[in-house]
Amino acid sequence: MSDKSDLKAELERKKQRLAQIREEKKRKEEERKKKETDQKKEAAVSVQEESDLEKKRREAEALLQSMGLTTDSPIVPPPMSPSSKSVSTPSEAGSQDSGDGAVGSRRGPIKLGMAKITQVDFPPREIVTYTKETQTPVTAQPKEDEEEEDDVATPKPPVEPEEEKTLKKDEENDSKAPPHELTEEEKQQILHSEEFLSFFDHSTRIVERALSEQINIFFDYSGRDLEDKEGEIQAGAKLSLNRQFFDERWSKHRVVSCLDWSSQYPELLVASYNNNEEAPHEPDGVALVWNMKYKKTTPEYVFHCQSAVMSATFAKFHPNLVVGGTYSGQIVLWDNRSNKRTPVQRTPLSAAAHTHPVYCVNVVGTQNAHNLISISTDGKICSWSLDMLSHPQDSMELVHKQSKAVAVTSMSFPVGDVNNFVVGSEEGSVYTACRHGSKAGISEMFEGHQGPITGIHCHAAVGAVDFSHLFVTSSFDWTVKLWTTKNNKPLYSFEDNSDYVYDVMWSPTHPALFACVDGMGRLDLWNLNNDTEVPTASISVEGNPALNRVRWTHSGREIAVGDSEGQIVIYDVGEQIAVPRNDEWARFGRTLAEINANRADAEEEAATRIPA
């Protein structure tokens, strides 16, 4: 072991010695290179100095010659050693003089003399400059100005004509050469690519908005034309036409079956449509999303499915989703983020879900806990999660007192309530029901209509007084009735219509205002604080088509109606009608008290007449 360690130590010492030798050699090499570079620099500097001295000498000679002074070559005696000077003899001096004379004869005679030096100073040339400004008419020098302008204008480079010629030649060649023609396969590949479809859909929507925008550039902010518009302002107190939505392909020959405004984007309106019997090859069910913000005449989104869409709604808390209930019983879900027009989700056609037409779909709950509620005409109510439509979370059949199931045609939830709701049926009866609890299912029955219920809606305006127990219904019996959940008899019957009343809805902001539409194409607004016998405002749609659906905007300032010919009409509601005053809730309370008193008197009179 000791021998190996000694050997290793010896190797280490040799390695260190070799490293020292290499470093010493490297250091010497660097010093040698440094010396060489220094010498080169010194030589270059000396050459430069010599050249500078020679230049200065030539300049001095030239200056003297210009002054008339001749320069003689200086006599440079031969170098003599000190020893030769000290040991020189006369003979040697003579011989040296003769030798010098010979040299002098070669270089020219030497003339010595005295001269007076005249010093001459040449002052530099004085340049006097000054500026002077005067005001003079410029008409006296038109030619000079033109010349100056010509001088200032930069002439075109001579290369430009050649460039133009080459450009023209290139253009001619390009025009003569036919462009590369894409094959049909390449065209179809581009047209069906995901990037092109996304770009085309997005770009056409923007271009449509820009082309359809109309701005009144003659608007007068001074108010001078207010007198001319006084009649229009008075008419605006009632109803005025705002927009009409109709698509030649997707709306024609279809019936508007449902309307709903988006809560996230108030300008968006979804409308569902029945099948088009004139076009059997088109999809049976269609849902169109219309935009009120832009003046475009085409729908923002087009969705369709295989079965007629009987109901549609924007999925609350999910602004990209649209829910539809179909005639086949399926619940379909469309997503506007997808490039497909067909549903991204749908419920199965099985006994676990709906097998009859779904006329009612509604999203209830809060941001963190909400469900989709659907009811079909076989009386089955289902609760769904929007994330999974493969099977319902909960289902129940609405049956009244062990009789047959209730054929539901309409449904409404009170404001802020997710458990209790009211439904209208094909038999003409109205029912209250609840989803959960010991009394889940049908609670009470309300009788009063003589025909199927077409529309039902709970009181929606929130204010100082709670009127959530009120609801209105419309029916085929040409009437609209006012109800309260506290009494199974109608509070009041509005009988001003002369045709089927297809839909009814409370104003979302005014406590005493509701709207209804009938089969004669008439839209009525009822303000119960003003009158209960005749509507406050009425308007008929052009052509008098049957109006199937009515829907207020969330602001209560516009109202949409859909007809049997596929057209949607938007009306502006006058401020005097739409905007409630502060005392409207108290006035409506007094109106209800009067209605209750009149109903009690009528019941007493009827009771006294029966025995007689």
Swiss-Prot record:
The modification Diphosphoserine is found at S51. Homodimer. The cytoplasmic dynein 1 complex consists of two catalytic heavy chains (HCs) and a number of non-catalytic subunits presented by intermediate chains (ICs), light intermediate chains (LICs) and light chains (LCs); the composition seems to vary in respect to the IC, LIC and LC composition. The heavy chain homodimer serves as a scaffold for the probable homodimeric assembly of the respective non-catalytic subunits. The ICs and LICs bind directly to the HC dimer and the LCs assemble on the IC dimer. Interacts with DYNLT3. Interacts with DYNLT1. It is found in: Cytoplasm, Cytoskeleton; Cytoplasm. Residues 82-91 have a biased composition (Low complexity). Acts as one of several non-catalytic accessory components of the cytoplasmic dynein 1 complex that are thought to be involved in linking dynein to cargos and to adapter proteins that regulate dynein function. Cytoplasmic dynein 1 acts as a motor for the intracellular retrograde motility of vesicles and organelles along microtubules. The intermediate chains mediate the binding of dynein to dynactin via its 150 kDa component (p150-glued) DCTN1. Involved in membrane-transport, such as Golgi apparatus, late endosomes and lysosomes. Residues 1-188 are annotated as: Disordered. Residues 1-13, 20-43, 164-188 have a biased composition (Basic and acidic residues). WD repeats lie at residues 251-300, 304-344, 353-394, 403-443, 448-493, 496-536, 542-581. PANTHER family: CYTOPLASMIC DYNEIN 1 INTERMEDIATE CHAIN 2, DYNEIN INTERMEDIATE CHAIN. The modification N-acetylserine is found at S2. Keywords: Acetylation, Cytoplasm, Cytoskeleton, Dynein, Microtubule, Motor protein, Phosphoprotein, Repeat, Transport, WD repeat. GO terms for cellular component: cytoplasmic dynein complex; dynein complex; microtubule; outer dynein arm; vesicle. This is Cytoplasmic dynein 1 intermediate chain 2. It holds the Pfam family Dynein_IC2. PROSITE patterns: WD_REPEATS_REGION (PS50294). InterPro entries: DYNC1I1/DYNC1I2, Dynein_IC, WD40/YVTN_repeat-like_dom_sf, WD40_repeat_dom_sf, WD40_rpt. It comes from the Eukaryota. The modification Phosphoserine is found at S51, S84, S91, S95, S98. The modification Phosphothreonine is found at T89. It comes from Mus musculus. Its main location: cytoplasm. One of its GO terms (biological process) is microtubule-based movement. Belongs to the dynein intermediate chain family.
